[in-house]
C-alpha cells in the first residue's frame, strides 16, 4: 500500500511542475490557441511523462521516504528468513529476486514497488515482523510478490498516464474557450489578462478533474488488491492469507502515504469506500473464503 501512495504523490508533484511548464509554453508559443492536435500531443507527452518519472523513481523514493534499510547480508535469523521466503516465492511466480528491506514503523504493513518485475523492492515494517506469526508474515510477503508478478505498477502507470492526458487536455481545452470568451468581452484586459484567465481556469480544472479521476485510480487499486490476495492464497494457502488479514483488523491504521499505500497490505480508512485504495478487510476475507 505504501507503494501506491508514494506513486500518486510523486505523480501529483510532477504533474504540478509539468502544468507550470505547459502554461509557460502556452504563453510563449500560443500553440494551444490554434491547434488542438498540438495540445493533444503535449498532453500525452506531459501526462505519461509524469507517470513514467514516478515509476522510475518509485523504488529509491520509497526507501528514502520510510527510511528503509536494504538487507544485503542477513544479520539475524529474521532477516535470513525474510530473504529465503521472498526468494522462494519469487521463483514460484517466475520473477527476479526483489530487493528486500526493513523499515521502522509500529504499524503492520509491507509494500512492493519498482519499474520492472525483475527489478523490484519488497519492504516490511518492524511492526509487522513483531506482531505477526511467521505464517501470517509469509502470506503478506506473498501478497506483495503477487503485486509484482501481476505487473500492477506498470498497469497503474499506463492507466495514470491516460488519466493525466485526459485531465490536461480537457482542462486546457476548456480554459482556452473561457479565456477566449472573456478576452473578447473585455478588450481592455489584453494578453496578460487573457493568460491569467487561462492559467487560473486550467489550474482549477486540473485539480477538479484530477480529484474525480482519483475515483478511477482507487477503484483500480481495490480491484488489484483482490487479485493480490488470491495470488497469495495460491502461493501459501488461503487460510494463511485470511489469518494475516484477521491480524490486520486488530492493528492500527496504516501510516503509509502516496503510491506506497496502494500496493501495501493494508490501507487507510476513508469517509467513502470510493476513495479507499484497499477494499474493507471484511470484503477481502469474504472473497478469500469463497475461493
UniProtKB/Swiss-Prot annotation:
It is a multi-pass membrane protein. GO terms for cellular component: plasma membrane. One of its GO terms (molecular function) is metalloendopeptidase activity. Its EC number is 3.4.24.-. Belongs to the peptidase M48B family. The active site is at 144. Keywords: Cell inner membrane, Cell membrane, Hydrolase, Membrane, Metal-binding, Metalloprotease, Protease, Transmembrane, Transmembrane helix, Zinc. The keyword Glycoprotein does not apply. The chain crosses the membrane at residues 4-24, 36-56, 151-171, 199-219. Zn(2+) binds at residues 143, 147, 225. Binds 1 zinc ion per subunit. Its cofactor is Zn(2+). It comes from the Bacteria. This is Protease HtpX. GO terms for biological process: proteolysis. It comes from Aliivibrio fischeri (strain ATCC 700601 / ES114) (Vibrio fischeri). It is found in: Cell inner membrane. Its main location: membrane.
Amino acid at each position: 500500500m505504501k507503494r501506491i501512495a508514494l506513486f500518486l504523490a510523486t505523480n501529483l508533484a510532477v504533474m504540478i511542475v509539468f502544468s507550470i511548464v505547459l502554461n509557460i509554453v502556452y504563453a510563449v508559443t500560443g500553440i494551444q490557441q490554434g491547434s488542438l492536435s498540438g495540445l493533444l500531443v503535449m498532453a500525452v507527452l506531459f501526462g505519461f511523462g509524469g507517470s513514467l518519472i514516478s515509476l522510475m523513481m518509485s523504488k529509491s523514493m520509497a526507501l528514502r521516504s520510510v527510511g528503509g534499510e536494504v538487507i544485503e547480508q542477513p544479520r539475524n535469523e529474521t532477516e535470513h528468513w525474510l530473504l529465503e521466503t521472498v526468494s522462494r516465492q519469487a521463483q514460484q511466480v517466475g520473477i527476479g529476486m526483489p530487493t528486500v528491506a526493513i523499515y521502522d514503523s509500529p504499524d503492520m504493513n509491507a509494500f512492493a514497488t519498482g519499474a520492472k518485475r525483475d527489478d523490484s523492492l519488497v519492504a516490511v515494517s518492524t511492526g509487522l515482523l513483531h506482531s505477526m506469526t511467521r505464517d501470517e508474515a509469509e502470506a503478506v510477503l506473498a501478497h506483495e510478490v503477487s503485486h509484482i508478478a501481476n505487473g500492477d505498477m506498470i498497469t497503474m502507470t499506463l492507466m495514470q498516464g491516460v488519466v493525466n492526458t485526459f485531465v490536461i487536455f480537457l482542462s486546457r481545452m476548456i480554459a482556452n474557450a473561457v479565456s477566449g470568451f472573456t478576452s473578447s468581452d473585455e478588450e481592455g484586459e489584453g494578453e496578460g489578462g487573457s493568460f491569467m484567465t487561462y492559467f487560473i481556469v486550467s489550474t482549477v480544472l486540473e485539480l477538479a478533474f484530477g480529484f474525480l479521476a482519483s475515483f478511477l485510480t482507487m477503484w483500480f487499486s481495490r480491484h488489484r488488491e483482490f487479485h493480490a490476495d488470491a495470488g497469495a492464497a495460491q502461493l501459501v494457502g488461503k487460510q494463511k492469507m485470511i489469518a494475516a488479514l484477521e491480524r490486520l483488523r486488530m492493528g492500527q491504521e496504516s501510516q503509509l502515504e502516496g503510491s506506497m499505500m496502494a500496493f501495501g497490505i493494508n490501507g487507510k480508512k476513508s469517509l467513502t469506500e470510493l476513495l479507499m485504495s484497499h477494499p474493507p478487510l471484511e470484503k477481502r476475507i469474504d472473497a478469500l473464503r469463497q475461493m
